[in-house]
Amino acid sequence: MGYTAAVAGASGYVGGELLRLLLAHPDIEIGALTAGGNAGTRLGEHHPHLTPLADRILTETTPETLAGHDIVFLALPHGHSAALAAQLDADTLIVDCGADFRLADAAAWQKFYGSEHAGTWPYGLPELPGARAALAQTRRIAVPGCYPTCGTLALMPAFAEQLVEPEVVVVAASGTSGAGKAAKPHLIASEVMGSVSVYGVGGAHRHNPEFVQNLSAVAETPVRVSFTPVLVPMPRGILATCSAPLKPAIGLDEVRAAYQRHYDAEPFVHLLPEGQWPTTAMTLGANTAAVQVTVDEAAGRLVAVAAIDNLTKGTAGGAIQSANLALGLPETTGLPMTGVAP
């Protein structure tokens, strides 16, 4: 049985990546393509690489346009999904690539996003404990943020097996596409090229409470997270370097064994051989995460590094992976496992 899918926010980076992946999906037919200010224009004006869809006209994002599809992917700015989703049929599979339904803590949502909390949907990171079962029974999916996807995959086995103390430092470098497609002075080429900068320092980034939520759930105890994002001059990709204090008598053998237990059967998470470290180039265009872990014996700390493509595994690919599970399809359906090189 085939399914039809609408993409709301099709002119943006996430919308474009969804369409690139959906074009290769054997069980999903692309339906309505909608946009905000770009409604009425050709898709090819915004995504010239999507040749098969180049002449499709973007329509306004309304409940009427999205109705009648089996799946609706929402690639909208934060805070715009909840009202629209409330007007769609309960049987429609809605996959929200924004932040509206990620956080369970209403106070955390209000603190970091400044609006009324819309609620919580099943969280679309299948690799988390219990996530696949929850996704298989839902018609509403909240796609994780790109930074929490990367950092959570770097750290999850260590917290799941109680190898580290409940505190962690995450420093994650990301390309500029993570900030979206809208023009911003600090993202123009003359500002970004040749420069590396931090932002959202001191726990101010909106993904901070998502890290806390994920890792605390895995560890089954509150985890303190110090997260610093770094903007680097490349279009896409995230490299997260994470460090946490090891519990007594934990060494590298125990750590690697834990990561192997958790990731050997995961189709999209690759634990690299000892001595090989993740790079963003490894995952470019693929729905994969490259992970490596070691022990800093002098500091008594675990060091875990992960790389993903922020638009693929970090958003659009993760959205389709979760949708596959909700539809009863193999979760790898239509998703690339190999990156693009050089």
Swiss-Prot record:
Citing just one GO molecular function, the answer is:
NADP+ binding
Active site: residue positions = 146
Where, subcellularly, is it found? Cytoplasm
Annotated pathway: Amino-acid biosynthesis; L-arginine biosynthesis; N(2)-acetyl-L-ornithine from L-glutamate: step 3/4
Gene Ontology cellular component annotations, sorted alphabetically: cytoplasm
Q: Which Gene Ontology terms describe the biological processes this protein takes part in?
A: L-arginine biosynthetic process
Primary residence: cytoplasm
Family according to the record: Belongs to the NAGSA dehydrogenase family. Type 1 subfamily.
Q: What does this protein do?
A: Catalyzes the NADPH-dependent reduction of N-acetyl-5-glutamyl phosphate to yield N-acetyl-L-glutamate 5-semialdehyde.
Q: What is this protein called?
A: N-acetyl-gamma-glutamyl-phosphate reductase
Organism of origin: Thermobifida fusca (strain YX)
